[in-house]
């Protein structure tokens, strides 16, 4: 436990919280969950919330680059550093080498102070000071990290990605395309809102936000979407949030529900539904006049579906905690009863590394292979629930063909009566 005194340097708390997030992620937590927890526990001003987010997500995103600098600047390789020290040095190095508006003294002094006041690290405060000051000298001398000779390793180090992933990118897209995707994986993602047309309209929400000093613009090809620029602060305090005028949803995710072409009166099944972004979108598209079943294995996560539906004023969504792949066994009366089925399948998430920076360090070729049987089980298990002439949409947020095109090709071979109506893939460098 780290206690901060009144005489602690200004800006210590945001850096400490970012350090907490890095340690939690290294211990297996998801970055967005860990970040949300530390922000919820503290009543921070908007600028400090923004700093915590940028430091945590930025240092996680650039873990490989920061480790390479640690290997060069320290006497002990990054992998062999005490974990607490390694992640604290990442927070400091990220500010010095990869951020522009942070004073050098603030980056160094806060890191040294955090070491001094942290149990087990006090004796290593001089190491923190030495490494960060060495980084300053290196930066002032204009020195850069040497790149490996082979292209996959070059791309991986330059963009802080695993070698196996850049190797695949080159196979899929060629050298130039791979570089474009790798660069897109490190882009700071936009914040997109989806306007609830049952309660407001995009122009009205835009006007309400502008009155609170929040600028937004419509998203091309996304009729209900607004993109926020330069945001900070707690979104729950923004105009229209409590009233259910809008929710947060990435523009690419907003494109999924319309593919089902849902109609009022339909029975609609959303498998793997939590936290409810697509289920609520489906309800909005049919004017809340449908029977929608939001199914998820996690009863805890389903509570978020219910909470989001309630805030948006939607009454057509029924939540069910169940394994969607075995739904027919639990509800045999549901056979051929759904006009629309959405399978938002569990996947590697390789298309969303910009939004989920920790995924690049968690996903492995082995973990992807482990997902393939789950995806197949969902497709085969839910197909009998589809009514004649019904529509099934299989959606993922990955770019791996084994999880996408190959799953659908195999499904069509197993079920020749199916007709493929539409197939499309968006790459991270092509996203709007």
Which stretches of residues belong to each language-model region?
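S-adenosylmethionine
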Residues: 1-432
């Amino acid at each position: 436990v780290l206690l901060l005194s009144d005489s602690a340097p200004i800006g210590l708390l945001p850096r400490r919280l970012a350090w907490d997030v890095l340690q939690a992620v290294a211990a297996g937590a998801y970055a967005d969950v860990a970040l949300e927890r530390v922000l919820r526990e503290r009543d921070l001003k908007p600028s400090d919330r923004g700093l915590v987010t940028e430091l945590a997500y930025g240092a996680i995103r650039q873990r490989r680059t920061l480790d390479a600098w640690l290997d060069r600047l320290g006497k002990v390789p990054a992998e062999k550093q005490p974990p607490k020290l390694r992640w604290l040095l990442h927070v400091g190095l990220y500010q010095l080498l990869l951020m522009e508006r942070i004073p050098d003294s603030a980056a160094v002094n806060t890191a040294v102070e955090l070491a001094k006041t942290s149990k087990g690290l006090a004796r290593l405060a001089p190491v923190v000071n030495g490494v960060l000051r060495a980084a300053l000298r290196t930066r002032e001398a204009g020195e850069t990290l040497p790149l490996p000779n082979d292209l996959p390793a070059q791309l991986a180090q330059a963009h802080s990605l695993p070698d196996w992933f850049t190797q695949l990118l080159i196979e899929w897209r060629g050298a130039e395309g791979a570089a474009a995707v790798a660069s897109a994986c490190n882009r700071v993602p936009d914040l997109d809102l989806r306007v609830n047309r049952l309660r407001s309209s995009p122009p009205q929400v835009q006007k309400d936000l502008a009155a609170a000093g929040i600028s937004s613009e419509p998203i091309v090809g996304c009729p209900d979407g607004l993109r926020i620029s330069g945001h900070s602060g707690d979104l729950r305090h923004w105009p229209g949030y409590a009233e259910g005028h809008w929710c947060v949803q990435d523009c690419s995710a907003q494109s999924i529900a319309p593919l089902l072409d849902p109609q009022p009166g339909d029975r609609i099944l959303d498998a793997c539904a939590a936290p409810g972004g697509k289920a609520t979108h489906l309800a909005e598209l049919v004017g809340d006049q449908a029977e929608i079943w939001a199914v998820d294995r996690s009863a805890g996560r389903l509570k978020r579906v219910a909470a989001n539906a309630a805030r948006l004023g939607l009454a057509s969504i029924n939540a069910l905690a169940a394994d969607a792949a075995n739904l027919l066994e639990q509800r045999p009366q549901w056979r051929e009863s759904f006009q629309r089925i959405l399978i938002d399948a569990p996947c590697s998430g390789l298309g969303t590394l910009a939004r989920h920076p920790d995924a690049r360090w968690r996903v492995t070729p082995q973990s992807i292979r482990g997902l393939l049987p789950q995806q197949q089980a969902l497709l085969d298990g839910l197909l009998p629930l589809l009514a004649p002439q019904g529509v099934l949409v299989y959606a993922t947020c990955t770019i791996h063909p084994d999880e996408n095109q190959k799953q659908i090709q195999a499904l069509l071979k197993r079920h020749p009566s199916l007709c493929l109506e539409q197939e499309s893939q968006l790459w991270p460098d092509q996203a709007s």
